[in-house]
Design a protein with these regions (language model features):
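Short loop/turn segments that connect beta-strands within beta-propeller blades
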Residues: 38-42, 104-108, 140-143, 184-188, ...
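Serine-hydrolase catalytic core recognition
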Residues: 348, 357-666
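Surface-exposed loop and turn segments in beta-propeller and other repeat-based domains
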Residues: 49-53, 248-264, 395-409
Length: 666
């Protein structure tokens, strides 16, 4: 297990606005460092000296507009709640800090800026960030201490410098509403752009700095509508004139469930063209919006989704990843696309059996960099120029990493009882026993998609390595892409009666277990299941409802009690189906079916989990003990949901595999 878990994983890939400079972070068995490369040779250079598996994340990596500096945050867990709260996965007697650092690319000197978070760099080398909820500033070229820029009430988000770096747009959440402000200098009061009782977000400057586009959604709480009936969540695109502060609506979402708001991409391409993302046709796609006539043009039509969208520095091109290509199997892959915005011309930059993600343009050179993986090789940074692509840092693949022995997952599909087509990937090594034990893997999220190769997310690259290890041991593993996940359209992503409203997605997991049990090479009496987070919830649900099918399971930081998804009513007015909704949430929870849970289980949780509170597992274990039900458990003190310390991750991986092997093989 340790060998296959030695994969290095990149993150934070970024490029300078001009020139040929790229940078990224690399996690090498818990040792996280920043690498820098510059054209024409693009030879990677390590820029940081962090040599310990200490659980300290690197995030917010970015170049200064002049390309002379790199800025990043070290510490925290920015994939969970309380992102700026320190992580002490090593259980040190002095807590680590969440700090902003800068790197002078001319000298290589690494300097701490301040204990703070959320940096944003403006032209030419102006740095702002959040400290104590307020905005501070400094100049990267200066040795002077940072100072607070101004004070404002509320929670600050969406900080964006104007193109000339002289003004700052931001939003402030004040509970019932959010407003868009512009700061110029300490002598000028903050100007509020088209302030209203709505929630304004995602401010984006026009290229000429004369206007700001933003997204507007409803404010307040509104009436107590039924909780179990899906409702349209409207949103609008507005633009505010900087000179007057007045705004106007440019576009309003269709009044359909598909048209609902879900935090889409938004940017200016030209002074008259806005690019935005919408689910309105049933798939996550890009659209252009003309300011002059409000005409909307679809840029990426087809039955696939786009994500990880990046605009070029000159605003002439977009790039993104998508699950489409020449083969039906590309539905479970990612390839890179691009759009020439002058002609709205769509091009596909990559194809084949690999996984490519997180593309960035390299300045205005036409080159691009992105994550690249296969079914066997984990992600590295790739550089593409024209038809030629080269990999960077192949030397980081450990000599004992079992790349050549890893299997290629194969795509399968099956039907749930209600007729829904469900996709998955089978991991199986050739040979071995005539009848092999089977394991279902349930991913977390749930807004995730497992792929026919290494995932572009570090958490799921780890679970991919577990699936490979289980296949090596002789298991047949089926990774199920159940409903609520992405990649298969809106209705699959947002089904009725999901999660606490009925857990309709569980039937996909059960159908996967039955599909696996009925394979000719699988022993149907030896089926196990494991999963983390939402997958932990589904694991416990499987064991509680169907112990006759799922003979053993490993529940990693799962959710077990959904009753708390609805707050207790504090006013006279409550949803007409409030009591029914509470009952459905209870019945959707694993704890409601403990009487039929007979299969062995291993519970694993860390106690600084910011995504699923450790109390979810503590409460379930208490219930087990009160009912005198057997279980095994592992508590990881100090770590988070994302196993920030590699040693802890490997311990969890090995324990998962050992528990399944003990009950299904030994």
């Amino acid at each position: 297990m340790e060998q296959v878990a030695k994969f290095s994983f990149p993150s934070e890939l970024t490029s300078s606005p001009s020139g040929e400079k790229i940078a990224w972070a690399m996690n090498e068995q818990g040792k996280r460092n920043i690498y820098f490369a510059e054209g024409p040779d693009f030879l990677p250079k390590k820029m940081t000296p962090f040599m310990n598996d200490d659980g300290q994340e690197i995030s917010s990596l970015q170049f200064s507009p002049d390309g002379n500096w790199l800025v990043f945050v070290r510490g925290g867990d920015h994939g969970g709640g309380n992102a700026s709260s320190t992580v002490n996965a090593e259980n040190l007697t002095l807590l680590p800090k969440v700090e902003i650092w800068k790197i002078n690319l001319s000298t290589g000197v690494l300097t701490q800026v301040m204990e703070a978070d959320s940096p944003v760099v403006g032209f030419p080398a102006r740095l702002i960030f959040l400290k104590g909820g307020q905005i501070w500033e400094t100049d990267l070229n200066s040795a002077e201490k940072p100072k607070q820029l101004f004070e404002v009430k509320g929670t600050v988000n969406g900080m964006q410098f104007s193109p000339d770096g002289k003004q700052l747009a931001f939003t402030v959440n004040r509970g019932s509403h959010s407003i868009l402000g512009v700061f110029k200098d300490s002598a000028t009061p903050i100007r509020w752009m088209e302030a209203s009782f709505h929630r304004d977000s995602n401010p984006q400057w026009s290229p000429d700095g004369k206007s700001i586009a933003f997204i507007r959604t409803l404010g307040g709480k509104g009436a107590a509508f039924p909780l179990l009936e899906p409702r349209h969540n409207p949103w609008e695109i507005w633009v505010a004139d900087l000179a007057t502060g007045k705004g106007k609506e440019l576009w309003k979402s269709p009044e359909t469930l598909r048209g609902s708001y879900y935090n889409p991409f938004l940017t200016f391409a030209t002074a008259d063209k806005i690019i935005f993302e919408s689910y309105q046709d049933g798939w996550q796609h890009l659209y252009s919006l003309s300011l002059s006539d409000q005409k909307v043009t679809a840029l990426t039509p087809g039955n696939y989704m786009v994500e990880q969208i990046k605009l070029s520095a000159d605003s002439k091109k977009l790039t993104f990843s998508a699950n489409t290509g020449d083969s039906p199997q590309d539905l479970d892959r990612r390839h890179i696309g691009s759009i020439d915005l002058a002609y709205n011309k769509l091009n596909w930059e990559t194809s084949g059996t690999g996984i490519e993600a997180y593309p960035v343009w390299v300045g205005n050179t036409g080159k691009m960099a992105f994550f690249s993986a296969t079914a066997q090789r984990s992600h590295l940074i790739a550089l593409k120029e024209g038809a030629n692509t080269k990999l960077l840092q192949e030397d980081l693949i450990p000599s004992d990493f079992p790349q050549k022995s890893l299997v290629t997952p194969r795509q399968v599909s099956f039907r749930a009882p209600d007729g829904t087509t469900v996709y998955g990937q089978i991991f199986e090594k050739e040979g071995g026993a005539a009848k092999k034990p089977g394991v279902i893997f349930a991913h977390g999220g749930p807004q995730r998609q497992m792929l026919l190769g290494w995932s572009y997310m570090d958490y799921y690259s780890n679970t991919y390595s577990i699936n490979q290890y289980l296949a090596e041991l002789g298991f047949v593993v089926l990774s199920v892409n159940y409903r609520l996940g992405i990649g298969y359209g809106y209705e699959f992503h947002r089904p009725a009666n999901g999660y606490h409203q009925g857990a309709v997605e569980y039937q996909d997991i059960k159908a996967g277990g039955e599909y696996l049990a009925n394979l000719a090479q699988v022993n149907g009496d030896k089926i196990g299941i494991y999963g983390g987070s939402y997958g932990g919830f589904l694991t416990s649900l499987a064991l509680a409802r169907d112990s006759d099918l799922f003979k053993v399971g490993v529940d990693i930081h799962g959710v077990h009690d959904l009753d708390g998804r609805y707050d207790l009513p504090e006013t006279y007015e409550v949803a007409p189906d409030y009591e029914k909704a509470k009952k459905v949430a209870w019945e959707s929870s694993p704890i409601s079916d403990l009487a039929s849970w007979t299969s062995p289980v291993l519970f694993i949780h860390s106690d600084d989990d910011r995504n699923v509170n450790v109390s979810q597992t503590a409460d379930l274990i208490r219930r087990f003990e009160e009912l005198k039900m057997p279980y095994e458990s592992i508590l990881i003190p100090g770590d988070t949901h994302h196993w920030m310390k590699w040693e802890n991750m490997v311990r969890v991986d090995q324990a998962t595999a050992d528990f399944l092997k003990k009950h299904l093989m030994d």
